């Protein structure tokens, strides 16, 4: 549980949990720290907006649902790591003919381990995928990845993520 609202009850939460208080797992690839920081970031900006009167308190209802999805992914990833780490190596892996499973697992989970694989479903905050055509090359609800770009006006190289700074304004 990420809040104090009992299953089936319809009210705004008053108590929240984050990080290892609500998802404990074995430390294998460092993803737990990233997920914990994402929990608190997700809750923090919502609390600020509600307390400053910028958002309706019902916004706080989205925290538990969003983070529960990520916590489930964390536990699933942990189980995959356990299976890979406990499985015996194959002859092909020992001969070097096949990349070791642990390396493949690490590569397959780089975004999750690095804390950039966040994907939120349609909700109070995210538009339905019916609007996906408006965001070509980006998946609605997924974390935006910065990219190197060249500004046309002066040919200056820069990171796109540095241009769109987080300033707490809705756009």
Predicted regions and their residues:
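FAD/FMN-dependent oxidoreductases across multiple families
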Residues: 1-35, 70, 74-78, 158
């Amino acid at each position: 549980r990420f809040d104090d609202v009992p299953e089936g009850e319809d009210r705004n939460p008053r108590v929240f949990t984050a990080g290892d208080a609500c998802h404990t797992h074995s430390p294998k690839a460092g993803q737990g720290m990233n997920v914990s920081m994402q929990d608190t970031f997700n809750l923090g900006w919502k609390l600020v907006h509600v307390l400053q009167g910028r958002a309706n308190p019902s916004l706080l209802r989205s925290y538990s649902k969003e983070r529960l999805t990520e916590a489930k992914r964390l536990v699933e990833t942990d189980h995959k790591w356990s299976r890979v780490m406990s499985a015996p190596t194959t002859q092909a892996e020992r001969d070097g003919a096949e990349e070791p499973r642990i390396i493949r697992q690490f590569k397959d989970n780089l975004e999750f381990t690095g804390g950039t694989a966040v994907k939120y479903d349609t909700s109070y905050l995210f538009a339905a995928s019916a609007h996906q055509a408006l965001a070509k090359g980006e998946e609605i609800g997924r974390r935006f990845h910065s990219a190197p770009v060249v500004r046309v006006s002066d040919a200056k190289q820069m990171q796109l993520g540095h241009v769109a700074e987080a300033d707490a304004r809705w756009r």
